[in-house]
Amino acid sequence: MKYELTATEARVIGCLLEKQVTTPEQYPLSVNGVVTACNQKTNREPVMNLTEQEVQEQLDNLVKRHFLRTVSGFGNRVTKYEQRFCNSEFGDLKLSAAEVALVTTLLLRGAQTPGELRSRASRMHEFSDMAEVESTLERLASREDGPYVIRLAREPGKRESRYMHLFCGDVDELSLQTSAPESASGDLQSRVEALESEVAELKQRLDSLLAHLGE
């Protein structure tokens, strides 16, 4: 597989994929928009504190690798960025809406169980049941042009195995186990995180609207 992203590149692409679906009226994103999305406190693991310069460097690298493209011209006072990572006109990677939702959530949050993924990805795609989540993960794991995700060995005392994306190369399962946050009542925690993320998104929309009205 030709995808060897750094953790920061994965964060940038994940943010653009997320905002393309959840806030299409703000997409494509400016550099400042990408910085804000990357450093969100909700629906991000780990939480990052990237500077504008660091984000600009990542954007420039991803444009050179044809994973992003710049959008400027009439009506755009600042350069904006849109993803060409998947489902672009000339790109090879084609994903369904369900696959985009899961890949995005894995890029933003790292290894997660199907239950966590269903809850956290719900704002991008409404999965009808757990079977749809699991079948989508299996498709991503068995694609001829992939695999794009891997099922990790189930940890002792856990009911579900976690899944991890492979866009940053092979997975070190031992380091993932030692760095995995302890989840108390996983489904409830996921619902709370989803609500917090929705509130943050609404605040961002309101700020954008107020700024627009003030122009």
Curated annotation (Swiss-Prot):
SUPFAM superfamilies: Winged helix' DNA-binding domain. InterPro entries: DUF480, WH-like_DNA-bd_sf, WH_DNA-bd_sf. This is UPF0502 protein YceH. It holds the Pfam family DUF480. Signal peptide: none annotated. The gene is yceH. It comes from the Bacteria. The lineage of its organism: Bacteria, Pseudomonadati, Pseudomonadota, Gammaproteobacteria, Enterobacterales. Belongs to the UPF0502 family.
